[in-house]
Structure formats: structure tokens, C-alpha cells
């Protein structure tokens, strides 16, 4: 017998159908991934299963004495409580009884795993740490069915890996919503697709699901095309009038009425269509940012320690590290919102930065969708072409009747789609994206990936979505903690493998001290050489700058060619020198 059975379920809010004659069986020890577009009703379905939302029609049957634990997408509102007391209170509420000594031990153990002080207040925690605590309380209640709504949001990569291992060992059933494709692929035993009110079951292989889903959509579009052709033919027939009134043709008239009803109820497959970004091409210089021995501290804590790097036009850099390791701080430094205490930053010329803020601070929750984008003006200009704002927003799957909807009434995914619509409208040659994948459905993720891949400017991304990072960047800044940042040119998967090997070797090998000192000496030599190279780069750039000033003089090209040539030749020589030395600098960084 299934743990939970949903039969002939109907649920609608106004004209939006969430469930339409839906059927679902949830069995023991399953790990089910619930997939669907933003606004399809995934979170609502979890609320139905958790008895927070009633069905309009249909039935839901639970196995006797079943225990369900539910991790919501939103964090708790009361934050003036210690971590330990919060988890203890949640468990009391779940179990309806006092906590025993074994549970206290388990609470302390899980808090230790998350590396957080148990006496800290929830209000003192970062978004990621708070998510860990809420997650911990849900896991400790030992339910038969665990409902998780976007459990990986705000979690760092190490914690996501820990969660995967935990859920694989978990003896109960898990039903989860997630946009993290690696998490889905590694974990689920079955996929449930919620699409236009229907629930369809697929085998638990995400890559195979994508193939099957695309094939299903292709077949559906073909059927719809044939249906439309048949309906059109019948409409032409009925308009002829006289023949349709005969008794013999009454059945055909009735069939036409059925076809019209089917057409009215039909919900088409919605996909992003021709979304482009307002890109300024070849407008900035080759060097976007040059960081030289930069350091940043908060009181006595080192966030960034003596970091040097050159970001060139076209670089796509992924910022990876645990929560609190300094990724968002680095973004704010590059945005000019925070000042470094040591070192220097050179900002490139004519930079136009488009910034995706994970806190959505650029959206006014009390204004409508239209008012938030382009200040509500009807026309927009995208890559030099004028178009209607409503037509532009429809490409991001916003319907015309939603345009006056207030942002505070939108789902998390809809807010992020709106933020992307606003971001792509801004003319840019640099994209800075701080956790852009949170709350996005899988189709929107794919759209964002494709846009970043095609974008010819510079991109910096903070994300814990392993697939997203792997598919979009060509260089990594690995934030180690204690201010240390390493640059890698390998793929993210290789970085993780390398890290795991090092952890294993740490407990197996006992390297000879002389080898360690040799490696340190070699590393110090590379660091010295890097300093020399950075100084040389600075000299060449200053030389290019001086030559440019001379060449930009109004009368420069009016003078005799003999006077022009030496300066133009020298300019070309310096440009080539800069190209070569930048390649040498990148190779040196790889050796660190």
C-alpha cells in the first residue's frame, strides 16, 4: 500500500488550474523530484500533501500514523531565538512530546556538522547558515515522508554534498522541489512532472527525463497542429450554414461544439521566445579589473588576503566557496560598494555593469511588474531597436493580465524572472550575477545559461549550482576561507575531485619535510615572478595610455607621415607585448 495516494485531484485559484484530475502515489523509500515551471503549483502540491491546503475535488489518502515533516521555501519569521532552542522547539512541535537525552545528543551533533555556534541567535546568521538550521530541524524529526521545498537554496557546495549523502541514507521517503540539476541527478529515484495541472511520472534519471519531455512536447505540438487544422475545417463548414441545419448533420454540429470547448480549455506549452540581452560590444578596454595585492578585513577577521588578478574582456569567472568565505564581499568591492584596506584596484574604461542582486533590492515590492521595468514606460530600446514593453515581458512568460500585479504578490521564481527582464534591458559589457539561479525553474536556468554562453562581454558569477557554473564559466576563483583565494582554469568537477583526493591523502601520506620546503620555495619563486609581471603589465599599460593620448590629439593625423609612424608602430609593439605578458601571467597563476 502506498504511503500517500492522491486520486482525481482538482485545485484552482481563480482561472489558474493547479491540479486537473491529477493522480499520484508515493511509496516507501522513494526519493521523488517534483519538477515544473515557476507558477505551475509545485509548492502548492507540497502544501496539499502536508494538509495546509485543501483540494477543491478529489481525495488524498494517508497510511495510518504516517509522520510528515515539511521544509518550507521561506525561512522562519521569529529570529530572536538561539539555534539550539529553535531546533528543540521545532522537534517538540513535530513530536508533541518532551525531548529526550538521545535527541539532545543528535541536535548537538547536527549543529556541530554545520559548524555553527549553538548559542548564536538566528538573527545573527547568514542566509545560508539559517537555511542549514531550518533544514537540520526538519531532518532530525525522523519523519516517514520528508517534504523539501528548494532545500539547496543559499547552501554552499559542501553542505549540498553533505545533504545528498544524508538523504541517500535516510530510511524514509523524500519528495523535493529543486532547480539544482546535479542534486536531482545524484539523488532522485523518480521524477514527477507537474505541467498544466497534470502529474506525469518518469524514471529517476534527469538527463533521460529531459529527452523524454522534449519528445512528449514535440508530439503534443504535432497533435495540436492537426487539431487546429481540423477545427478550422469544421468552422468553415458551419459558416456555410444551410447544410449544417439538416437533421443528418446535427451530430457534426455537436462534435464542433465539443471541439470548441477543447480548444478553449487547451493550455499551450509555454517557452521562452527570442530573449536577448542589451549588450554593448567591443566598447570597454581589454582590462576590465586589475587587482593588485588587495586585502579586506572586518574588525580582526580577514576576508580577502593579498589577492592579485587581472580580469580581461570576455572572461567568465565563477566564484566558489563556503558561505561567509568572501564571495559577495568581492562582488561588492568590484561594484565599488566596499573599499579595500590594502592593495590597489584598477577599473577598466567605459565599463557598463549589469548586476543581479540575490536580495532583489532593485525590485520595489509595492510597485507593479510594469512599473519596475523601464519605470512603466510603454516603449523600450533593445540593441538599438524599439519595441513594446508588454511584448518584451511576454518573452519572460508574464501574461498581459499580470502586468499590473504587485511584485510582493509574485512567487520567488517570478521575481527572479522579472529581475532578469530588468537586467537584460540594461546596456552592458560586464555582468555580475550574485546567486542568479535561486528559485528559477529549469527552463529559465537553461535560458540564462545560453545567454551567458553567447554574451561576448565579461561575466562574474557567484553560484552554488554546480551544473550552472560548469556550463558557463572558463575560470574559477576558489575562496578557501581565512582570506585565501586560488585561481583555477580546470572544470568545477575536476576541482572537486582534486579536493577529495587531497582530503584522502591528508590521512594516508606522511610527506618528507624536505619535499614540503622544496614546494614552498618553488611557490615563493612563482609569487615573486608574479609581482614582477604585474609591475611590468602596469608599465606597458601606462605606455599604451601615453601613446593613446598622443594619437588622440586633434592634429596628430594632420602631421607628416614620418612623424606619425614611430608612435603608431610603438603603440602596436606595446599592444603585442601586453598580449604576450598576459598569457605568461595566466600560466604563472596556474602554478600556484
From Swiss-Prot:
Q: Which reaction is this enzyme known to catalyze?
A: ATP + H2O = ADP + phosphate + H(+)
The UniProt record gives the binding positions of ATP 1 as 36-43
Which InterPro entries does this entry report, sorted A to Z? AAA+_ATPase, ABC_tran_Xtn, ABC_transporter-like_ATP-bd, ABC_transporter-like_CS, ABCF_ATPase, P-loop_NTPase, Uup, Val-tRNA_synth_C_sf
Where is the protein found, in the record's own terms?
Cytoplasm
Indicate the transmembrane segments per the record: none
Position of the signal peptide: none
* Cellular component, GO, one term: cytoplasm
**Residues that bind ATP 2:** 321-328
Q: Does the keyword Transferase apply?
A: no
Tell me the GO BP annotations in alphabetical order.
DNA repair
Where do the record's region annotations for C-terminal domain (CTD), binds DNA lie? 518-592
Recorded hits in PANTHER family, A to Z, give:
ABC TRANSPORTER ATP-BINDING SUBUNIT (PTHR42855), ABC TRANSPORTER DOMAIN-CONTAINING PROTEIN (PTHR42855:SF1)
Q: Into which family does the record put it?
A: Belongs to the ABC transporter superfamily. ABCF family. Uup subfamily.
Q: What protein name applies here?
A: ATP-binding protein Uup
Organism expressing this protein natively: Buchnera aphidicola subsp. Schizaphis graminum (strain Sg)
